[in-house]
Amino acid sequence: HGTSRRQRQMCIRDSFENLPHGIIINGSTGIGKKILAKEIANNILLNFDKDNNLKHQVLFDKNTHPDFYLLDKDKIGVNDISRRDKWDEEKGFRDVVTFLTMTPSISKNKVVLIMNADLMNNAAQNALLKSLEEPAPYSYIIMTTNRPKALNQTIYSRCRQININNLSVIETNHWLEKVGVTDYNAMDFPSFATPFNILDDIQNDNHNSYKEFILLMNDFMFSKIDQSQAIKLFTDIDINFIGKINFLVEFLKIILASKLTDNQL
């Protein structure tokens, strides 16, 4: 989806013997890191044999594969990576290190996918290091991050990095058409908007927020509304504070670009 077919095929075509036990996928929120990560994980569990037993695929699709562990939390502490308590699914006693030390159940390999690994604190990152430094031959750790260089350098040194670049306007529009979005295009959203961000905005009825903001700023600059009206309208836009700051930065970039090229807004 957000990732290019070439990038996905490049990763999956890697020979199994040369595949590193640690992979970090870097890219903006909404660019498709999870899709790429799960595609790699799925192929590892299938041992890169698409004709392998169908039960692996069914279990993976249902997120119930016993040799796949997805860690996707808002905060990742040391207990999520390594804990003293015995692994216990019912009590929620689960951690990455224990999972990887257990023998594979039905696959030849075990895979952990850590979403937003940049949310790991230092203690959690240090706890993960041993699994990266001395991996079992069947264990693989895939991580995604939204920010470059957000992890300790020692982790990066033991992993292969895959960087997913943002799509161009043309590529984004092509992607939107493929998923059935024809009423909007990339120019209706800020330049930093990624495919799944755009889709979320459309589905959550926030697709006009950016255009409303640009019209508001344009009216204010040309004195069509006064400061108090502008502040009220700005406050009423239904996005969070960080989103509004990002819109402001985007608008300033547009102003700067127009000044540099001597174009009208």
Predicted regions and their residues:
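A generic secondary-structure signal
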Residues: 99-103, 131, 175-179
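Conserved adenine-binding aromatic site and its adjacent loop/helix in ATP-hydrolyzing domains
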Residues: 98, 130, 153, 157
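Short His-Asn-centered micro-motif
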Residues: 115-116, 144-146
